[in-house]
């Protein structure tokens, strides 16, 4: 082969003159020339000759446009698709095999793998509506499709049949945008039938997140008993309380009672009945006609009612937690003065979110969660202008990123404890000025009312509070004279307190929580030193046992349990307001530092609930 002659001077063709005249001399870097229609690249070859590559950028679009014109005018077509669907008259569409094969793996296999259709001029197609096939053929030529909501399911089904993934994704995205309580189950079932995993998952997630609304729709009542049992068994079902799930099951049975009454017992075992309140169970046992007609179901619920009211230890009921994630919230706190911060920590990625501030700065407050809502109870506003003990109860909604005021406590309570039984908040002890409370009051969110219950046997401020087996435990604190190691337990059915085994260590301002059916007391102040020791109470043996100590001494700390681990946040070590956050792993009996607060502080209110709505946060932070 003869080598290409080296160009000398300008090429003979004058149309290349602008290109060649701009080529720099010597063997340098590649030079790119581009226009709106094409681009050319000049590069040196190994033998010193220059070559160029030329690309017409819109050639493919133009070529397919011409092929579409040929299709519409029935020129150069090499196949006719004869499409028959149910009782609809067959329709014929002329096309080019190469174009169909380029857009659909099914057509490619049909026309290239030696199948009988490869040599056929007329190919019969069944199982797809002619209008759908017409649109898919148009898409093969134009890369564009327009689908109305009434026929999107048919188009998506056809795109799945012919493996046109881009159309499947477009239809899936459209259907996700159309999800609402009335159609989510139908879309989920359709996606499962055609094997569209992503759409099926998105529709199921919508059902879980909007269960309360979905359970009122016709599609819900058309579920089979197996489908319903599977649905209500989900941990990520988003409900305010388990009674929503119970009512949904009873309503489903009532929809066709003669046929469905046989499934009541199986459904009740999928409901987390131990998460129902005794009062609710008692009402249903007395008034629900479905239960009255089924002795086995009635006996089953009576047994659960007795276990709850007798406070028997039961297997831990898995918490319903939507997959939006659960974060550790810290409200208020103290550093030189009371703070109004509300922040949330995500242990899964170590990030912090700054959320809507408390309406009034507070420290020494309690944090509680009912129905996914975060409540800030009592506290004190320490400010340069003076100190004011608070009787306020404020409610934070993660979905709106907003606080709203609720009914006030009967008395101000600084450094009180808070716990939740049967959806009711208990505010325990605390102080108002020099008055140290033994009183306890209960808040009913549905009525927005506080009511006093039996007082503790001991006055306590800086008291740690925990709830286990529907019993309220008050641990340690300060009675106005002495720091305490005593602890007592409240029985709501009897409305009375009883002393339990005292702790091994005097602790005021300790962090108290429940993990794996044990009560943990971490840190605190014994009257001389801040503590880093931790002990736990076994309700079965009624004994306190030391576990591994924290890395830092701390009192007035925040504490929370998240995914089987204990987190302690901030506090005071006797010299410094801490910003450290430690995590306890019960499997290894070890503490580790995992993150830091955005600033040191003590006396924070801490609780765990769902992740806030990012859209609301972004909108409220927007200064546009």
Curated annotation (Swiss-Prot):
The modification S-(2,3-dicarboxypropyl)cysteine is found at residues 151, 257, 273, 288. Non-enzymatic covalent modifications of reactive cysteines by electrophile metabolites inactivate the BCR(KEAP1) complex. Accumulation of fumarate promotes the formation of cysteine S-succination (S-(2-succinyl)cysteine), leading to inactivate the BCR(KEAP1) complex and promote NFE2L2/NRF2 nuclear accumulation and activation. Nitric oxide-dependent 8-Nitro-cGMP formation promotes cysteine guanylation (S-cGMP-cysteine), leading to NFE2L2/NRF2 nuclear accumulation and activation. Degraded via a proteasomal-independent process during selective autophagy: interaction with phosphorylated SQSTM1/p62 sequesters KEAP1 in inclusion bodies, leading to its degradation. Its main location: cytoplasm. Residues 77-149 form the BTB domain. The modification S-(2-succinyl)cysteine is found at residues 38, 151, 241, 288, 319, 613. One of its GO terms (biological process) is regulation of epidermal cell differentiation. Transmembrane segments: none annotated. SMART domains: BACK (SM00875), BTB (SM00225), Kelch (SM00612). Substrate-specific adapter of a BCR (BTB-CUL3-RBX1) E3 ubiquitin ligase complex that regulates the response to oxidative stress by targeting NFE2L2/NRF2 for ubiquitination. KEAP1 acts as a key sensor of oxidative and electrophilic stress: in normal conditions, the BCR(KEAP1) complex mediates ubiquitination and degradation of NFE2L2/NRF2, a transcription factor regulating expression of many cytoprotective genes. The Kelch repeats mediate interaction with NFE2L2/NRF2, BPTF and PGAM5. KEAP1 contains reactive cysteine residues that act as sensors for endogenously produced and exogenously encountered small molecules, which react with sulfhydryl groups and modify the cysteine sensors, leading to impair ability of the BCR(KEAP1) complex to ubiquitinate target proteins. Component of the BCR(KEAP1) E3 ubiquitin ligase complex, at least composed of 2 molecules of CUL3, 2 molecules of KEAP1, and RBX1. Interacts with NFE2L2/NRF2; the interaction is direct. Forms a ternary complex with NFE2L2/NRF2 and PGAM5. Interacts with (phosphorylated) SQSTM1/p62; the interaction is direct and inactivates the BCR(KEAP1) complex by sequestering it in inclusion bodies, promoting its degradation. Interacts with NFE2L1. Interacts with BPTF and PTMA. Interacts with MAP1LC3B. Interacts indirectly with ENC1. Interacts with SESN1 and SESN2. Interacts with HSP90AA1 and HSP90AB1. This is Kelch-like ECH-associated protein 1. It comes from Rattus norvegicus.
